[in-house]
Amino acid sequence: MRVLRLLAFALCGHLLGGQVFAQANFLAGIPRNEVLIAENPQGRITNPTWFNIWVVNHGGDSNGLQQLGMDTLWYIDADAGIDGVWDNSLASDKPTYNADFTEMTVKLRDGIFWSDGVEFTADDVVYTVETQMKNPSMLWGPAFLASLDTVTAPDKKTVVFKLKRPNSRFHALFTVRWNAAWIMPKHIFEKQQDPTKFDFNPPVTLGPYTLKSFDPNGEWYIWQRRDDWQRTTLARFGEPGPKYVAYIDPGPPDKRVIMQLNHQLDIIHDTSPEGMFTLAKQSPSSHGWFKGFPYAHPDPTLPAVILNNQVDAFKNKDVRWALALLIDIKAVSLASYRGAATISAIGVPPTGLYPKYYFDPLEDWLKSFEIDTGKS
């Protein structure tokens, strides 16, 4: 029955001609072989004309803005730990701290330019920090205010941060695991009376792409590779492959699968296990993170059974512990994610280096753990 429903849905989608995302609607004039089409995991953006990524409750940041247009000092592989992959992006090297970790110095790359031709300098970094400290409602303002005393630029490629107290992790604010403090274009924002009310439309980018067009209803965004991509930090890896990248809201999981089967969606961010099984069987050109089950990269988060602590019974931690021990989490995983969910006995996922840091030391304690209910 499930197969029949899927076939019927696929036939319906074919007959409708992909009415939501008919290629003529958003790829007009763009050859299909020059564009990479990716799912926007945020779906439809409700305020699509807003590109000021530095304010709380901003517009979309998974619509290509963060991925293709923004840049900051460093990137790391969060799964690899502190001795793992470290990539200097806008910075030319790792941060340098003084002996007591109250001062951090950063050297910046030469030859990096904003998409409007203005050179990126230390003034942009200083402006980014000071502006958000002066406007603590901005996204990174509170974090900067908590740690930072002053930030200065001795020259156009050096930034010095003086901290209020020792903090050997201050650089983490500028280090991307998924997100970080993106650098603002000083020459654009300094002209605005209130940086929190500026829509930054169209965005001036440090990344290798610029915004070409977008749907006023927030359904799709198209980005075009910069002619001067060599003047971005990504150039150290070579020329970006696709000339265009489209981020779209492809709809629910079933529709994403159908679109990929029809080569209308190149990258799926999320789908159901059933959807991945369908792609694995029917689409030779579709590949997951792994060749086989569970296909996807284990996310550093945990699907979970969440209890409402406002309910009187659940306010008692012993009740919550009892339920945690009573519920068969393997059955929950099989019923909800076909066994593809990451399972953990504690509030930390067993991915990356976490097994070494948390699970191995706690293994014996977890195996022997019992809860005293007061009843025999």
Predicted features, each with a name:
Residues 64-81, 177-240, 244, 254-255, ...:
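Gly/Pro-rich hinge or "lid" segments in bacterial periplasmic/extracellular proteins
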Residues 7-17:
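Bacterial N-terminal signal peptides
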Residues 109, 197, 229-280, 321, ...:
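Ligand-site clamp/hinge motif
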Residues 41, 174, 236, 269-376:
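Local pocket/hinge segments that shape ligand/substrate recognition
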